[in-house]
């Protein structure tokens, strides 16, 4: 089973420009490490011109720490298709950079242990939040010469219960099968503006990005504290429009079980830096979680 790229040429280039763009993002890339301290990362999933550099910071850190065998990638289900919690079962995902294999055994075991997920490919058919992560992984895997695999999971339900159930299942499955993994939570942060129907504050155009950042930082601080409950409390209190909190919650739960003790915000920006539009402003953050 091959899942074909559906947003190549839209969210990211579908030709040789993709490699050139990735090279530009990674001009400061260091040597591949072997520490393997990073347990999870947060990366945005907007068009590369808006959030590609921010996403690259997460993958740069992972590469310099050492690539894992498997990336378990969680993204929000924007389409509403398929199972509410859908683990892609088997086969390969294709992008302009080639194909990357799904770890079928790990996918199945996570699904079984979670008791809330289904093996389902329909939810992934048109979803972009996981696909846009793959060129970063493929580019670095090619540099490394490693045969990296993935387990894609879309979330149509995102709450504390899902975070704990899936985070625990991913940890137990990876331990049981002896897999070295990193969890990637694919999410954008605040979606502000009339375009999104979310205008909790108004200000001059030059002030808006800072206000968006302030509100995002209320959530990000909770993430950096590994505080799942606090993160959802902040989101609910502000009616915050972050689109992938469930995946971040899973990353926190998994990381704590895996022994992570620190989290770092590597980069933050908003779409305003590129678009200069206040009709729609989206926040983007790069975060990693690490063991001692």
UniProtKB/Swiss-Prot annotation:
SUPFAM superfamilies: LigB-like. InterPro entries: MEMO1_fam. Gene3D superfamilies: LigB-like. CDD domains: MEMO_like. It holds the Pfam family Memo. Transmembrane segments: none annotated. Belongs to the MEMO1 family. This is MEMO1 family protein PF1638.
């Amino acid at each position: 089973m091959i899942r074909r790229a559906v947003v190549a040429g839209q969210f990211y280039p579908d030709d040789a420009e993709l490699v050139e763009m990735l090279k530009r993002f990674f001009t400061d890339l260091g040597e591949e490490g072997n520490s393997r301290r990073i347990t999870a990362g947060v990366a945005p999933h907007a068009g590369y011109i808006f959030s590609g550099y921010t996403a690259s910071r997460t993958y740069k850190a992972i590469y310099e720490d050492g690539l894992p065998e498997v990336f378990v990638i969680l993204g929000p289900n924007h389409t509403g298709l398929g199972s509410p919690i859908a683990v892609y079962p088997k086969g390969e995902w294709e992008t302009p950079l080639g194909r990357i294999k799904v770890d079928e055994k790990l996918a199945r075991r996570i699904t079984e242990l979670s008791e809330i997920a289904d093996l389902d490919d329909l939810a992934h058919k048109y979803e972009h939040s996981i696909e846009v992560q793959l060129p970063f992984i493929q580019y670095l895997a090619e540099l490394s010469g490693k045969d990296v695999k993935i387990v894609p999971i879309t979330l149509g339900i995102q709450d504390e219960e899902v975070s704990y159930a899936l985070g625990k299942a991913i940890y137990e499955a990876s331990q049981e099968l002896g897999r070295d993994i990193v969890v990637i939570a694919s999410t954008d942060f605040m979606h502000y503006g009339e375009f999104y129907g979310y205008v909790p504050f108004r200000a001059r155009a030059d002030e808006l990005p800072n206000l968006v950042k302030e509100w995002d930082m209320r959530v990000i601080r909770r993430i950096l504290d590994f505080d799942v409950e606090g993160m959802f409390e902040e989101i609910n209190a502000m009616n915050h429009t972050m689109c992938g909190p469930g995946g971040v919650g899973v990353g926190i739960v998994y990381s704590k079980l895996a022994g992570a003790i620190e989290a770092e915000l590597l980069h933050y920006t908003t779409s305003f830096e590129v678009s200069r539009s206040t009709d729609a402003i989206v926040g983007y953050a790069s975060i990693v979680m690490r063991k001692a």
